[in-house]
């Protein structure tokens, strides 16, 4: 029983550790876009329709094209009438934990 607890704790810690690029400069670009906060939590760019109290976002979709900068991310979401957000993994269009992209003027 203790083995499974220790093994689970070890694996959870290993998976939660951020990936470092080859130069040792921080988060690898493949994990989070430069317009989302660094780390693993808010690494999913989403275009959301409804923002509830700045925390929960409803009716979210992935951007129709891959944004490369914050301004292009905002422009892509504006074209479909939504707001750019960086979210935790959304489930069924409900992104319950989201934040504004880095450098956004919302």
Swiss-Prot record:
Subunit (UniProt): Homodimer. Homodimers further self-assemble to form highly ordered films at water-air interfaces through intermolecular interactions.
Induction record: Expression is up-regulated under Alternaria alternata cell wall and Alternaria alternata fermentation liquid treatments. Expression is also up-regulated under nutritional stress conditions. Expression is down-regulated in the presence of poplar leaf powder but up-regulated in the presence of poplar root powder.
Keywords assigned by UniProt, alphabetized: Cell wall, Disulfide bond, Secreted, Signal
Disulfide bonds: 36-86, 47-77, 48-60, 87-98
GO annotations of cellular component type: extracellular region
Domain of life, per lineage: Eukaryota
Protein name as catalogued: Class II hydrophobin 6
Subcellular locations according to the entry: Secreted; Secreted, Cell wall
CDD domains the record matches: hydrophobin_II
Signal peptide positions (record): 1-16
Similarity section: Belongs to the cerato-ulmin hydrophobin family.
Primary role: Aerial growth, conidiation, and dispersal of filamentous fungi in the environment rely upon a capability of their secreting small amphipathic proteins called hydrophobins (HPBs) with low sequence identity. Class I can self-assemble into an outermost layer of rodlet bundles on aerial cell surfaces, conferring cellular hydrophobicity that supports fungal growth, development and dispersal; whereas Class II form highly ordered films at water-air interfaces through intermolecular interactions but contribute nothing to the rodlet structure.
InterPro entries named among the record's database cross-references: Cerato-ulmin_hydrophobin, Hydrophobin_sf
Entries under Pfam families matching the protein: Hydrophobin_2
């Amino acid at each position: 029983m203790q083995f499974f607890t220790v093994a689970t704790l070890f694996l959870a810690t290993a998976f939660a550790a951020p990936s470092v690029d080859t130069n040792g400069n921080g988060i690898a670009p493949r994990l989070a876009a430069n317009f989302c906060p660094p780390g693993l939590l808010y690494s999913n760019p989403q275009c959301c329709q409804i923002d509830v109290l700045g925390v929960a976002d409803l009716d979210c979709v992935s951007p129709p094209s891959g944004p490369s900068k914050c301004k292009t991310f905002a422009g892509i979401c504006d074209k479909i009438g939504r707001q750019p957000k960086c979210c935790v993994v959304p489930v069924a269009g409900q992104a319950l934990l989201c934040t504004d992209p880095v450098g956004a003027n919302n």
